[in-house]
From Swiss-Prot:
InterPro entries according to UniProt: GcvPA, GDC-P_N, GDC_P, PyrdxlP-dep_Trfase, PyrdxlP-dep_Trfase_major, PyrdxlP-dep_Trfase_small
Name by which UniProt lists this protein: Probable glycine dehydrogenase (decarboxylating) subunit 1
Gene this protein is translated from: gcvPA
UniProt cross-references to NCBIfam families, sorted A to Z: PRK00451.1
Keywords: Oxidoreductase
Family: Belongs to the GcvP family. N-terminal subunit subfamily.
Domain of life: Bacteria
Gene3D superfamilies per UniProt: Aspartate Aminotransferase, domain 1, Type I PLP-dependent aspartate aminotransferase-like (Major domain)
Length: 451
């Protein structure tokens, strides 16, 4: 729709109504030193037709590279129906509605989403979503401190194998709240936390242990052993998981003897495209006994006065719009539109379809390993992987990535950017979107880049 600005008459009428002579008077209180000068670099106004031509010219400059980067954001096939349905007028909102019970369709969809997520994770309860995977982990840490009444230390063990961005965001959010994040090193041979390395913490007051599955290197952690160790210390277990991997892997609710206490992660692989970093959504599930400490909105099913099934926002006393000073979190909305897409995505795939996607991801990753072995490019860690793997290169990573990019292949993520001692390691992801020809192309371009 074309933008129709105010006329000069409109502007003068509005200024007269508020008792000022010109627009500049509205900004008198801002010191001149802080004001922005004339925007000389802004081009002259263009007509709608001229803007359309400009956008077509710029769009023609774009090209799509073959992408093998993962590191927390993954390229999956999204059925066309997902966003066609999600962007219908009935759904097209980022929020759960303010008059929630008047929007039964939206509430039912969120309820179905929560049901699907508890099924995937093996947990009892899911919320309606959080902002993203990183903030979901931070909220899980805060939640564990509230929920673990046996612990007074507020010490949370955070493995170095957790996504570096997640660790950074968590540090920022819990800063100043009396919570100590203790980094746990990983075994350089396996690329995962060795349960024996936790012996130094035995007998100490530990609030929670974070377990990424798979971890940032793509390696599967020994979740059962780590979970049992944490519970033996009266610590809670926070699982950080990839939802697609749960179609193949043991759900966190079944880890060890008792299962995880809180599960969170990034929901982007469930129907959200790679779009300059967002919008994504975070998910969180927990055991029923911890539900009153869970942040975010929760949709429940009930009966109305006439005995008909209905859906409501339940346990709202946890939320900041009810009792801000006692709320479990200051999150005041959620990623409802992306959750809508995720729900449709999971419904279209079904359990068998999601399992096929996960199996194809795993198969492609191992097929890529075989193609790279003759080049002297081998897995850096002995641990089993899901759909992402760290390779050790015979040459520095950054020049290799630059050379591959020039050939239209995004070769992976340089782990040296976040781990100074892993400068020769390249993190590569091959999802179900990669064909045999794509894998061959990757190996061909990698060979040329190493030459």
């Amino acid at each position: 729709m074309p933008f129709i600005p105010h006329t000069e008459t409109d502007i003068q009428d509005m200024l007269a109504a508020i008792g000022v002579n010109d627009i500049e008077q509205l900004f008198d209180e801002i010191p001149s030193a802080l004001r922005t000068g004339p925007l000389n670099l802004v081009p002259e106004a263009m007509s709608e037709m001229e803007i359309t031509r400009l956008m077509h010219r710029r769009a023609a400059q774009d090209h799509v590279d073959l992408n093998f980067i993962g590191a927390g954001a993954y390229e999956h096939h999204i059925p066309a129906a997902v966003w066609q349905i999600a962007t219908r007028g009935e759904f097209y909102s980022a929020y759960t509605p303010y008059q929630a019970e008047a929007s039964q369709g939206t509430l039912q969809l969120v309820y179905e989403y929560q049901t699907m997520m508890t099924g995937l994770t093996g947990m009892d309860v899911s919320n309606a979503s959080l902002y993203d995977g990183a903030s979901a982990l931070a909220e899980a840490v805060l939640m564990s401190v509230r929920a673990n009444r046996k612990s007074k230390s507020h010490r949370v063990l955070m493995p170095a194998t957790v996504n570096p961005v997640y660790r950074s965001v968590t540090r920022a959010i819990v800063h100043g709240q009396g919570i100590e994040l203790v980094e746990v090193p990983f075994d350089p041979a396996t690329g995962r936390v060795d349960p024996k390395s936790l012996a130094a913490f035995e007998g100490q007051d530990i609030t929670a242990l974070v377990i990424p599955q798979p971890n940032f290197f793509g390696v599967l952690e020994e979740a059962d052993a780590l979970t049992d160790w944490a519970h033996a210390q009266d610590a809670q277990v926070i699982g950080v998981v990839n939802p697609v991997s749960l179609a193949l892997l043991k759900p966190p609710g079944e880890w060890g003897g008792k299962g995880a206490d809180i599960v969170c992660g990034e929901g982007q692989p469930l129907g959200a495209p790679l779009s300059s970093g967002g919008p994504y959504f975070g998910f969180m599930c927990c055991r029923k006994e911890h539900v009153r400490q869970m942040p975010g909105r929760i949709v429940g099913r009930t009966l109305d006065a006439d005995g008909r099934t209905g859906f409501v926002l339940t346990l709202q006393a946890r939320e900041q719009h009810i009792r801000r000073s006692k709320a479990t979190s200051n999150i005041c909305t959620n990623q409802g539109l992306v959750v809508t897409a995720a729900t449709i995505h999971m419904a279209l795939l079904g359990p068998e379809g999601l399992e096929r996607v996960a199996a194809a991801c795993h198969a492609n990753t191992h097929a890529l390993i075989e193609r790279l072995k003759p080049l002297g490019v081998t897995p850096a860690f002995a641990g089993e992987a899901f759909h992402e793997i760290a390779f050790r290169l015979p040459r520095p990573v950054r020049p290799v990535l630059d050379a591959m990019a020039q050939q239209g292949v995004l070769g992976g993520y340089a782990l040296g950017d976040d781990y100074s001692d892993l400068g020769d390691l390249l993190l590569v992801c091959a999802t179900e979107t990669k064909t045999e020809a794509d894998l061959d192309r990757y190996a061909e371009v990698m060979k040329a880049a190493l030459a």
